[in-house]
From Swiss-Prot:
Belongs to the SprT family. Pfam families: SprT-like (PF10263), Zn_ribbon_SprT (PF17283). Its main location: cytoplasm. Keywords: Cytoplasm, Metal-binding, Zinc. The active site is at E79. It comes from Erwinia tasmaniensis (strain DSM 17950 / CFBP 7177 / CIP 109463 / NCPPB 4357 / Et1/99). The keyword 4Fe-4S does not apply. The gene is sprT. Its cofactor is Zn(2+). Residues 19-163 form the SprT-like domain. It comes from the Bacteria. This is Protein SprT. GO terms for biological process: response to stress. GO terms for molecular function: zinc ion binding. It is found in: Cytoplasm.
Length: 170
């Protein structure tokens, strides 16, 4: 899979938002937290992740390209808040009261835990499986475990083993 190329103007807009919110937080918290490293290598359906020990933010390049302004407005401060909470409070719940306070009171933004971006372009391939009562979709990882004989999955509703293939109504 080839990496997405982020236009320079978009990278600059991301950095501007990051620096604005970091400066705002440093003023309100009376601290001088350093600028985190920023990387565009988040994969899957997550818009971004905050890496606490390495003080870095990883952003999903596909979702950034598809949702530019909303991504910059919401995801960049969201991940920055995780880093700031870790520095300010230590180890706490990821979206707990400290994170909510950081988002709302310090950064002045709504504390939303998840994004609402369309994820069809970043969703992993799934494989059809069936049981006695319905159709199921297994992730690539789970499908490969079945193929290698490492795992067997059962339907939570009827309890029968899942088998590859489409469900046929009788």
């Amino acid at each position: 899979m080839k990496p997405e190329r982020i236009p320079i103007c978009l990278q600059q807009a991301v950095m501007l938002r990051l620096r604005e919110k970091l400066q705002q937080a440093n003023l309100r918290l009376e601290r001088n937290y350093p600028e985190p490293a920023l990387h565009y290598r988040q994969r899957g359906t997550a818009a971004g992740t905050a890496w606490l020990q390495s003080w870095e933010i990883r952003l999903n390049p596909v979702l950034l390209l598809e949702n530019q302004q909303a991504f910059i407005d919401e995801v960049v401060p969201h991940e920055l808040a995780h880093l700031l909470v870790w520095k300010h409070f230590g180890r706490v719940a990821p979206h707990g009261k400290e994170w909510k306070w950081m988002m709302e009171s310090v950064l002045g933004l709504p504390a939303r835990r998840t994004h609402q971006f369309a994820i069809a372009s970043v969703r992993s391939r799934t494989f059809p499986y069936r049981c006695g009562c319905q159709q199921h979709q297994l992730s690539v990882r789970r499908h490969n475990r079945v193929v290698r004989g490492e795992s067997e999955y059962r339907c939570l509703h009827c309890g029968t083993s899942l088998r590859p293939g489409e469900f046929q109504k009788s």
